[in-house]
């Protein structure tokens, strides 16, 4: 499956906000002009963006935040639309309960890309079973842990230390000494951090 491997800062500048693709705890705001589009001089056109363009940009932004490609994103939206409740909130819950995102939220990876790599390299277990599919859906009560062979990796230790300092989301409980965490429940919309307007995505797919 193809994935973007170019400069991460360029993606954040394209969306005009820090997508935290380089580090979960360190903002890009001090390193580059997020309000300036990528390119030698940035985008200078003052043309107003259409409603469709705004909706499309929001979808692209969310795809980049979670590292999901178009076909997969469409499947998530279709599933979110089938479920009871608010479609936009359902969509974010599906994305947040991906295994790679849960590993990231528990602080085992400093970015979602790093967390995805840990899963792909079989460094993660779910309920004691090795898991290597980043898109695996984690359920309430599932225990996600770092395998013994990976516990001494410096990047994991450092990421976990930074996450402890910054605080964990309320919907996960992490035992840093054991390198494991429990997915307590699906996050409520208010618990999901980030500059995301999911209603724009719902409007886009409702056209």
Swiss-Prot record:
CDD domains, alphabetized: S4
SMART domains recorded: Ribosomal_S4, S4
Segments of this protein annotated with the region Disordered: 31-55
Cellular component terms per the entry's GO annotation: small ribosomal subunit
Pfam families: Ribosomal_S4, S4
Domain of life, source organism: Bacteria
Residue ranges annotated for the S4 RNA-binding domain, each copy included: 97-160
Feature: compositional bias, Polar residues: 42-53
GO biological process, one term: translation
GO molecular function, one term: structural constituent of ribosome
Entry keyword set: Ribonucleoprotein, Ribosomal protein, RNA-binding, rRNA-binding
Residue stretches spanning the membrane: none
InterPro entries on file: Ribosomal_uS4, Ribosomal_uS4_bac-type, Ribosomal_uS4_CS, Ribosomal_uS4_N, S4_RNA-bd, S4_RNA-bd_sf
Chain segments annotated as coiled-coil in the UniProt record: none
Protein role: One of the primary rRNA binding proteins, it binds directly to 16S rRNA where it nucleates assembly of the body of the 30S subunit.
The family this protein is said to belong to: Belongs to the universal ribosomal protein uS4 family.
Assembly behavior: Part of the 30S ribosomal subunit. Contacts protein S5. The interaction surface between S4 and S5 is involved in control of translational fidelity.
NCBIfam families: PRK05327.1 (NF003717), rpsD_bact (TIGR01017)
Protein name (Swiss-Prot/TrEMBL): Small ribosomal subunit protein uS4
Native species: Burkholderia ambifaria (strain ATCC BAA-244 / DSM 16087 / CCUG 44356 / LMG 19182 / AMMD) (Burkholderia cepacia (strain AMMD))
């Amino acid at each position: 499956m193809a994935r973007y491997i170019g400069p991460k800062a360029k993606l954040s500048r394209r969306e005009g906000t820090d997508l935290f693709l380089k580090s979960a705890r360190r903002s890009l705001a001090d390193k580059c002009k997020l309000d300036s589009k990528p390119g030698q001089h940035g985008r200078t056109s003052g043309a107003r963006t259409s409603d469709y363009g705004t909706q499309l940009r929001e979808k692209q932004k969310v795809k980049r935040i979670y590292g999901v490609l178009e076909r997969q994103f469409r499947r998530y939206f279709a599933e979110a639309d089938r479920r009871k409740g608010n479609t936009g909130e359902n969509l974010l819950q599906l994305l947040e309960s991906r295994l790679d995102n849960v590993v990231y939220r528990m602080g085992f990876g400093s970015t979602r890309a790093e967390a995805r790599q840990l899963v792909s390299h079989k460094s993660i277990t779910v309920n004691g079973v090795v898991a290597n599919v980043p898109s695996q859906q984690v359920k309430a009560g599932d225990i996600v842990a770092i395998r013994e062979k990976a516990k001494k990796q410096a990047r994991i230790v450092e990421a976990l230390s930074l996450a402890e300092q910054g605080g964990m989301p309320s919907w996960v409980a992490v035992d840093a000494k054991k390198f494991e965490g429990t997915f307590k429940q699906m996050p409520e919309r208010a618990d999901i951090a980030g500059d995301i307007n999911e209603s724009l995505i719902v409007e886009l797919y409702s056209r």
